[in-house]
A protein has these predicted regions:
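Acidic/polar active-site rim loop that often engages polyanionic ligands
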Residues: 64-71, 154-164
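Glycine-rich phosphate/adenylate-binding loop
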Residues: 2, 116-120, 125, 130-133, ...
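Glycine-rich phosphate-binding loop and adjoining beta1-alpha1-beta2 segment
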Residues: 50-93
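Conserved SAM/SAH-binding loop
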Residues: 102-110
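Hydrophobic/small residue at the entry helix of a nucleotide-binding pocket
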Residues: 37
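Conserved N-terminal Rossmann-fold NAD(P)-binding element of oxidoreductases
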Residues: 31-33, 56
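N-terminal charged helix/coil linker that caps or initiates catalytic domains
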Residues: 1-30
Length: 264
């Protein structure tokens, strides 16, 4: 292992044991969704010495990303998120290998975007249907994947947990994903069985913005075509200390999986 690599990332071996850094250097992780959670996850993976990253997202940076997304800075607004994060990754590690896909994951492009086997997929996108299809696609192919639930509307990082997707609580989106996977993709209906998909979520109740400007735990009444979600201009509020904590919890689990001894 070259001297530069050891100087930059030697602390990883001193934490996980000799040889861990060499294994991470050989790993390939795909991050889907480079937003409030995904951008911080990419940062943590790059700083942990992961040698190859694939970044998938079609979004550009906007001013209202500033409260939660790592690359949202003056001079970067309007730039593709994957390009901004790629530049940052190369500054962290000039030898990192990057694959950039300026696309959103859809049921129709999973084979094209995820067809190359990787060591792990980290799902940080916020599209319900894409998450369902991606999890099902990965499980059919025995491709390890970590799913990230909703960080919006939450403020207490001590409530964040990592459990199998079949066991998550207090996350409406993950609950609906679980129902869809059982109903349409033949995931175990027996509640004693696990899905084999680690998920990051929070036990904290969601804080909803109200029409009068207050915030409380009561979901506001919406029109039939409206949906309350985390977005650039309205919907659920969010803060960096929570989106970042979700990301770091996901990367903590990723490190565990990537460094798990290989089965003979």
């Amino acid at each position: 292992m070259d001297t530069l690599w050891k100087e930059r990332f030697g602390g990883i071996d001193r934490l996980y044991g000799s040889g861990a850094l060499a294994r991470l250097r050989a790993c390939h992780v795909t991050v889907v969704g480079i937003g409030g959670v995904g951008s911080w996850a990419v940062e943590a993976l790059a700083r942990s010495g992961v040698g190859r990253l694939t970044l998938i997202d079609a979004d550009d940076l906007c001013v209202s990303n500033t409260n939660r997304q790592l690359p949202a800075l003056d001079g970067q607004f309007g730039r593709a998120k994957i390009e901004a994060m790629a530049e940052r990754c190369r500054a962290i590690n000039p030898h990192i290998h990057l694959n950039l896909h300026p696309q959103f994951v859809t049921p129709g492009n999973l084979d094209a975007l995820l067809g190359t086997p990787v060591d792990l997929v980290l799902d940080a996108c916020d599209s319900f249907r894409s998450k369902v299809e991606m999890i099902a696609w990965c499980r059919r192919r025995k491709q390890p994947i970590i799913a990230v639930g909703s960080a919006g509307g939450r403020s207490d990082v001590t409530q964040i947990r990592v459990r199998d997707l079949s066991r998550t609580e207090h996350d409406a989106m993950l609950s609906l994903i679980r129902k869809k996977l059982r109903g349409e993709f033949n995931f175990p209906k027996n509640h004693d069985r696990y899905f084999g998909v680690p998920a990051v979520y929070s036990l904290e109740n969601v804080r909803y913005p109200q029409a009068d400007g207050s915030v409380c735990g009561v979901r506001p009444q919406l029109g039939k075509d409206e949906a309350l979600k985390l977005d650039c201009g309205a919907g659920l509020g969010a803060a960096t200390h929570v989106t970042g904590a979700f990301a770091f919890a996901a990367v903590g689990k990723a490190m565990e999986l990537l460094l798990k001894p290989k089965q003979p």
